[in-house]
């Protein structure tokens, strides 16, 4: 394969830049693996070609991006110099795109830019921002990477901060992945506590909507990640059916990684669960099949589990919600008779026994996994969008990359 070296990329105009990447060659799985092997041996041309392929929005673009990201995220003594080359190539692309286009970093401009992955959530962006020295530029990149549609981020948010709060989107991506094949547990989309400009809550709306559409709901353990206002909790809801005496009981566990939640929030949650239970108990309520409810529901069991886990991890409530939910999901799949309270209590007790250093490491490793899930979401969405566009154009997918170097 012939490689053309072009220097002084940052001096190119938009037209010259497009022409530089005009020559194409077909990408295959064999080529990717060959480039990975030579890149790991320190070949700079292979590293830069992987970057050029990674700019693509097809499946090979994502695979090339994954190769580079995996090398950076899993450093060894043998790969430290390789990682430096990868980061340098990423920074060259970043500077190239911004200098050539004369645009500030704004995600809504990305459709008009040559290197879209450098202006949207991507693993290339994650690599780029890690070593950028200017805090203000890191914060600008963070706004794009975290795709802040819910306006959750403060101006000082740093995507690479090891102790920042996880966003709704990050939590949702992780929980969706771990619950994908769960049969005994269902995870609901993370929400705020109150509806905008209202005293009503997202939880009571969700409970009422579900029971109206299916009177036997919930059949599985329901998990609700809820942001109470700068703090995430996990609500577990389960209906226990006793067929012998024809009774049902609602069991609700509120898992809180702090030592307290506050009387207002606790009273609101009690009211919501009691109201939901009363609706279930209403003997005049009819099902969609016009059958009256005959099962008797006893008083609901509501337990607040204040785990007090954040002594060393002040901003990790979202991470604890994800890890606690994962504990429930995995254990319920291996034993459907497990009680969510027991699982959550055991998880909290086990975590407290770790040293401060061990807790930091567990939190750090979870955040890395969470970040991978989040960035993969956008990578997969890019692939789907790419192939949808090809179908619309009645064209077969052609996986191509530039034969030009980034240097």
From Swiss-Prot:
Pfam families attached to this UniProt entry? ElaD_SseL-like_N, Peptidase_C48
| Enzyme class at the top of the EC tree | hydrolase
Instruction: Name its GO BP terms in alphabetical order.
Output: proteolysis
At the top level, the lineage of the source is Bacteria
Q: What is its EC number?
A: 3.4.22.-
User: What GO MF terms are annotated?
Assistant: cysteine-type peptidase activity
Catalytic positions? 231, 317
| Entry keyword set | Hydrolase, Protease, Thiol protease
Which InterPro entries does the record associate with it? ElaD/SseL-like_N, Papain-like_cys_pep_sf, Peptidase_C48_C
- The family this protein is said to belong to: Belongs to the peptidase C79 family.
Query: What biological function has been recorded for the protein in this entry?
Result: Protease that can act as an efficient and specific deubiquitinating enzyme in vitro. Does not possess desumoylating and deneddylating activities. The physiological substrate is unknown.
Q: What is this protein called?
A: Protease ElaD
Q: Which organism is it from?
A: Escherichia coli O157:H7
Annotated gene: elaD
């Amino acid at each position: 394969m012939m490689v053309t070296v072009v220097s002084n990329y940052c001096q190119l105009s938009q037209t010259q830049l497009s022409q530089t990447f005009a020559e194409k060659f077909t990408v295959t799985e064999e080529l990717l693996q060959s480039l990975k092997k030579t890149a790991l041996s320190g070949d700079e041309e292979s590293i830069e070609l992987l970057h050029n392929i990674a700019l693509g929005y097809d499946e090979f673009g994502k695979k090339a991006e994954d190769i580079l990201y995996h090398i950076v995220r899993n450093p060894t003594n043998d790969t430290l110099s390789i990682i430096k080359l990868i980061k340098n190539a990423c920074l060259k692309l970043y500077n190239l795109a911004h200098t050539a286009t004369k645009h500030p970093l704004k995600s809504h401009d990305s459709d008009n830019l040559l290197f879209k992955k450098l202006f949207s959530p991507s693993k290339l962006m994650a690599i780029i921002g890690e070593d950028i020295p200017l805090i203000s530029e890191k914060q600008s990149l963070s706004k794009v990477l975290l795709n802040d549609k819910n306006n959750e981020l403060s101006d000082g948010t740093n995507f690479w901060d090891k102790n920042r709060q996880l966003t709704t989107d990050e939590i949702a991506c992780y929980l969706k992945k771990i619950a994908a094949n769960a049969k005994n547990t269902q995870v609901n989309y993370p929400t705020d506590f109150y509806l905008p400009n209202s005293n009503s809550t997202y939880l009571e709306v969700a409970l009422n909507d579900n029971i109206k559409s299916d009177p036997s709901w919930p059949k599985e353990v329901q998990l609700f990640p809820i942001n109470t206002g700068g703090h995430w909790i996990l609500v577990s809801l389960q209906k226990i059916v006793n067929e012998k005496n024809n009774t049902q009981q609602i069991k609700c566990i509120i898992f809180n990684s702090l030592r307290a939640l506050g009387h207002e929030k606790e009273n609101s949650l009690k009211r919501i669960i009691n109201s939901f239970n009363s609706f279930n108990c209403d003997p005049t309520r009819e099902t969609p099949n016009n059958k009256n409810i005959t099962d008797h529901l006893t008083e609901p069991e509501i337990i607040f589990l204040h785990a007090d886990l954040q002594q060393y991890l002040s901003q990790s409530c979202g991470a604890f919600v994800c890890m606690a939910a994962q504990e429930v999901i995995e254990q319920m799949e291996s034993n459907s008779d497990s009680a969510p309270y027991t699982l959550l209590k055991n998880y909290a007790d086990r975590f407290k026994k770790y040293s401060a250093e061990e807790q930091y490491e567990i939190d750090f490793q979870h955040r890395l996994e969470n970040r991978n899930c989040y960035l993969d979401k956008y990578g997969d969405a890019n692939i789907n969008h790419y192939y949808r566009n090809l179908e619309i154009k009645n064209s077969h997918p052609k996986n191509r990359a530039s034969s030009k170097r980034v240097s």
